[in-house]
């Protein structure tokens, strides 16, 4: 089972915030910054970004078993105890959508600011992201990761990340699956 450590941080609530996740087994650390947000949104964004990242990696997505380790009781209790999802619905919908691809997720709460080295590192990255206004930082550049992907893996990655693309790249509203995305990409070249 792949372990993923996630954390979010916010200066003020609301205020500038950062998120981070670490996948030690794959040597992946990713962080991001949002100008005006809440701590719960940042905690949840870290999880959504982590699942988006691994969904695009074919070798991982075949196993479909992950453990999300977070110091957010908000996330763990919502996912394991049926707490009501009445705020941050856009992120909860995205999380549900990502999980619907067959991920088997174990949700584990870890004590924050304790002796867990990966949780401490996630906190450091998340705080650093909002203090330094780091939009997105990866251990491998996007281009390095894209060059390693097959066309099919790239289509899956792109399809998973369509919601992030700037609309100036053209309309992709008719794209509903990876094969249609390949056709759309070919029509643009």
Language-model-detected regions and their locations in the chain:
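RNase H-like nuclease fold core
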Residues: 1-41, 45, 52-59
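RNase H catalytic domain
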Residues: 4-13, 48-138
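Signature tryptophan residues that serve as conserved aromatic anchors
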Residues: 19, 107-109, 143, 184
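Pocket-edge positions in alpha/beta enzyme catalytic cores
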Residues: 34, 38-39, 83-84, 114, ...
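Short acidic, low-complexity intrinsically disordered linear motifs used
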Residues: 139-153
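Short interaction-hotspot residues at assembly and binding interfaces
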Residues: 153-189
């Amino acid at each position: 089972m792949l372990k993923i450590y996630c954390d979010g941080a916010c200066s003020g609530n609301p205020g500038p915030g950062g998120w981070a996740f670490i996948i030690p087994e794959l040597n992946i650390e990713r962080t991001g910054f949002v100008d005006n947000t809440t701590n719960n949104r940042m905690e949840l964004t870290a999880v959504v970004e982590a699942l988006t990242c691994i969904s695009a990696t074919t070798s991982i997505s075949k196993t479909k078993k992950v453990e999300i380790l977070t110091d957010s009781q908000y996330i763990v209790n919502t996912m394991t105890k049926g707490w009501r999802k009445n705020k941050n619905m856009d992120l909860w919908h995205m999380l549900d959508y990502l999980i619907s691809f067959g991920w088997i997720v174990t949700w584990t709460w870890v004590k924050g600011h304790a002796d867990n080295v990966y949780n401490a590192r996630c906190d450091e990255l998340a705080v650093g992201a909002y203090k330094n206004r780091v939009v997105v930082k990866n251990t491998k550049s996007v281009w390095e990761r894209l060059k390693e992907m097959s066309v099919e893996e790239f289509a899956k990655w792109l399809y998973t990340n369509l919601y992030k693309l700037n609309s100036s790249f053209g309309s992709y509203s008719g794209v509903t699956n990876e094969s249609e995305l390949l056709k759309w990409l070919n029509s643009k070249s």
